[in-house]
Amino acid sequence: MSLWVDKYRPSSLARLDYHKEQAAQLRNLVQCGDFPHLLVYGPSGAGKKTRIMCILRELYGIGVEKLRIEHQTITTPSKKKIEISTIASNYHLEVNPSDAGNSDRVVIQEMLKTVAQSQQLETSSQRDFKVVLLTEVDKLTKDAQHALRRTMEKYMSTCRLILCCNSTSKVIPPIRSRCLAVRVPAPSIEDICSVLSTVCRKEGLALPSTLARRLAEKSCRNLRKALLMCEACRVQQYPFTEDQEIPETDWEVYLRETANAIVSQQTPQRLLEVRGRLYELLTHCIPPEIIMKGLLSELLHNCDGQLKGEVAQMAAYYEHRLQLGSKAIYHLEAFVAKFMALYKKFMEDGLEGMMF
């Protein structure tokens, strides 16, 4: 049994539920013959990967859906061996080079070299190039991005790249200038409500419009999250009711409790407890950027107007440090410690003002 988010994922550009004008433009791009490198970007849950797979289906036909998982071992110049998992068909290869950490440059060079030098076995597709899909390009090191730029030029005749990321701000200009940028905006609340209603109708379920809207708003316009929450509601209670509780993910509840612990007490002992909770989130593969963003959102609820600006500025500083560093826990803990000091001083100053 597959999840709704996979079961009802559109497989062609013609069947996409929203951004249909963009889908028509992508279809024209595929049919024109001169297919460029693509840089597909947009927020999480907007449908980037779905559109990329639809493009591949338009390029090569149904063969791209015959996927296999491959494990490759790449040896770095320092003789270090790196295990990389890829998803491949006869026509394309999908890889996340940032999984290799600081060795991502070697992974990119080896992967692209291997794909570009292999010939197509099936000529029925009438495409003389293969496609390499690189995900989370914005997390690549600068060395890897420069290596990617050189490799793009070298193997242009036999290989096309589709780069996928959340934001182009961390992608170097030479790569951006060599790709056709395709922005996939987050779906509107109405779009998400429409998709939820359609999926529930196909499942034979009656979804109240009020609940559909609550799901769409709670998902922050993330369609994948909305579908997962809707399916969780179905497991929790059916028939649906307009005011039924929408289940939250465990890590979101845990993060809210962590924020409440920070606000309730500002001591070294509490900081040590919070550090342990942050470690717990990181070991469960919650990205540090998501932790920082969620923590900031929860903490701002307990700040007044004057303090909000300082806390937001402080979070931006430590988020930047987070991107530059390699140990996320240091920067998350530093943000919490700085917030504790700022919040404690703010509360003490407020009490003094009330007394006098």
Swiss-Prot record:
**Which GO terms label this protein's molecular function in UniProt?**
ATP hydrolysis activity; DNA binding; DNA clamp loader activity; single-stranded DNA helicase activity
Question: Residues where Phosphoserine occurs?
Answer: S125
**Membrane-spanning regions, if any?**
none
Q: Which GO terms describe its cellular component?
A: Ctf18 RFC-like complex; DNA replication factor C complex
Q: Which GO terms describe its biological process?
A: DNA-templated DNA replication; positive regulation of DNA-directed DNA polymerase activity
Give the signal peptide as a residue range, or say none if absent.
Answer: none
InterPro entries recorded? AAA+_ATPase, DNA_pol3_clamp-load_cplx_C, DNA_Rep/Repair_Clamp_Loader, P-loop_NTPase
Q: Fill in the subunit field for this protein.
A: Subunit of the RFC complex, an heteropentameric complex consisting of a large subunit RFC1 and four small subunits RFC2, RFC3, RFC4 and RFC5; the RFC complex interacts with PCNA. Forms an heterotetrameric complex with RFC2, RFC4 and RFC5; this complex has ATPase activity but is not stimulated by PCNA. The heterotetramer of subunits RFC2, RFC3, RFC4 and RFC5 interacts with RAD17. Interacts with CNTD1; this interaction facilitates crossover formation.
Q: Which family does it belong to?
A: Belongs to the activator 1 small subunits family.
Q: What is the role of the protein in this entry?
A: Subunit of the replication factor C (RFC) complex which acts during elongation of primed DNA templates by DNA polymerases delta and epsilon, and is necessary for ATP-dependent loading of proliferating cell nuclear antigen (PCNA) onto primed DNA.
Name the UniProt record assigns to this protein:
Replication factor C subunit 3
Q: Which species does the entry assign this protein to? A: Mus musculus (Mouse)
